[in-house]
A protein has these predicted regions:
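Conserved signal-transmission helix
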Residues: 1-18, 55, 60-64, 200, ...
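Glycine-rich ATP-binding loops of the HATPase_c
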Residues: 177, 235-243
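Conserved glycine-/histidine-rich ATP-lid loop and adjacent helix of the Bergerat-fold HATPase_c
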Residues: 227-236
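Conserved micro-motifs of the catalytic ATP-binding
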Residues: 100-104, 144-147, 237
Length: 264
């Protein structure tokens, strides 16, 4: 084994332990100072207002001379507060993804909330954030169902990434994702622009899902899509994929009434 192979082996070992061993500590170490910055900034805003009010009462002439400078100071503090809140939102998006990956047990899952978190996480990929026209329509009344957040997060990450990359490689660069529900299913529809997927590839994919096989060769549909749909198949999901000249759609309907996931 040469140095390159040794490095690759260590790199893979590092990646394999990164989420479980390092991410919780990294998030914790970021959260504490960030919360401190936000709290101190709010406190500073209040103190500035209170002290300047006292200054105007005791030394009105001096306060009048300092008014312009005080307005600049308050504006700067507001900017710091707004930027720290923006950073906090970004931090929450990152944390939500890694907490989802750690939630391997069975729990109540809301599909719209999960998809919203996944889409916010994809904003960290700047090509996918800026170069694709996205249409996101989420059913805020979608009911929960029982499942593993970790499994579902990984499955929908793979499906969304596949669709977004195909959209990115197309002329129209369009992507849409929709959630909805009826009296039995919560459903997700993922649609992207791009060349039509070969019917033969779709047929092979559906056969693999039915058989539980993870073999997927000589196909424009990557193995990540197959693995994602195999996971969803354990939830008794209705899975369909169809493709036309310029768009492809993956639809998944997961039962939520008196249904428990099948574990294979």
């Amino acid at each position: 084994m040469d140095n390159h192979e040794s490095y690759q082996t260590l790199e893979e070992a590092f990646a394999a332990t990164f989420i479980k061993e390092l991410i919780p500590g990294i998030l914790h170490n970021f959260a504490n100072p960030l919360n401190g910055i936000m709290g101190r900034t709010k406190l500073l805003q209040r103190r500035i207002e209170e002290n300047f009010k006292k200054l105007k009462e005791i030394y009105p002439d001096a306060a009048a001379e300092m008014m312009e400078e005080m307005q600049r100071i308050k504006k700067d503090i507001r900017s710091v507060s707004q930027e720290s809140e923006s950073f906090h939102d970004i931090f929450k998006d990152v944390a939500a993804k890694f907490y989802a990956l750690a939630a391997k047990g069975e729990d109540n899952v809301n599909i719209s909330q999960l998809i919203n978190s996944e889409m916010r996480f994809f904003d960290f990929n700047l090509d996918l954030k800026h170069d694709i026209k996205k249409n996101i329509r989420l059913d805020n009344d979608a009911p929960d169902f029982r499942g593993s957040t970790a499994e579902l997060s990984m499955a929908f990450w793979a499906l969304i990434r596949f669709a977004m990359l195909r959209a990115l490689g197309s002329k129209m660069k369009e992507f849409s994702i929709t959630t909805e529900h009826d009296n039995k299913y919560v459903s997700v529809f993922i649609k992207n622009s791009g060349d039509a997927l070969p019917a033969a590839s779709i047929d092979v994919l559906m056969e693999r899902i039915d058989s539980g096989s993870r073999e997927m060769t000589n196909s424009v549909i990557d193995r990540g899509v197959l693995n994602a749909l195999l996971i969803l198949n354990k939830y008794n999901a209705r899975i369909n994929m169809f493709s036309e000249e310029s768009f492809s759609t993956i639809s998944i309907g997961i039962p939520y009434r008196n249904e428990r996931p099948k574990r294979k």
